[in-house]
């Protein structure tokens, strides 16, 4: 059984998630909302993908900071890809890349986790 679970975390996979930032930043000070949101996204990706090395895309960072430090979006749709580290002397074998996913016109309601087939 331990071999199965270990193999699961070793796969290269891409998934789409909706992260509710509102509940994660509820008790946060105004002037710390955007930096804390980035930290919470990193924490979410670590837990979801099982990797310690999480890289946040520049576009996602811009989207979080687009309305300023204190008016963070309530929810954000992200695409998290677990990838192999090509660098030989890297500490971790895998890393997670978090990017912005396109939001449908009808909104974020009812969207669950979606596994994306590799386009490569």
Swiss-Prot record:
One of its GO terms (cellular component) is cytosolic large ribosomal subunit. GO terms for biological process: cytoplasmic translation. SMART domains: Ribosomal_L31e. Signal peptide: none annotated. It holds the Pfam family Ribosomal_L31e. Keywords: Ribonucleoprotein, Ribosomal protein. CDD domains: Ribosomal_L31e. It comes from the Eukaryota. Gene3D superfamilies: 3.10.440.10. One of its GO terms (molecular function) is structural constituent of ribosome. Belongs to the eukaryotic ribosomal protein eL31 family. PANTHER family: 60S RIBOSOMAL PROTEIN L31 (PTHR10956), LARGE RIBOSOMAL SUBUNIT PROTEIN EL31X-RELATED (PTHR10956:SF52). This is Large ribosomal subunit protein eL31. It comes from Nicotiana glutinosa.
């Amino acid at each position: 059984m331990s071999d199965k679970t270990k193999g699961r975390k070793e796969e290269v996979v891409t998934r789409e998630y909706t992260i509710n930032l509102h509940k994660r930043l509820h008790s946060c000070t105004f002037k710390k909302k955007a930096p804390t949101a980035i930290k919470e996204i990193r924490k979410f990706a670590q837990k979801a993908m099982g990797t310690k090395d999480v890289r946040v895309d520049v576009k996602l960072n811009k989207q979080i900071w687009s309305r300023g430090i204190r008016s963070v979006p309530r929810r954000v749709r992200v695409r998290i890809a677990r990838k192999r580290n090509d660098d030989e002397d890297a500490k971790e074998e895998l890393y997670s890349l978090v990017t912005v996913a396109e939001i449908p016109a009808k909104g974020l309601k009812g969207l669950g986790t979606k596994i994306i087939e590799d386009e490569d």
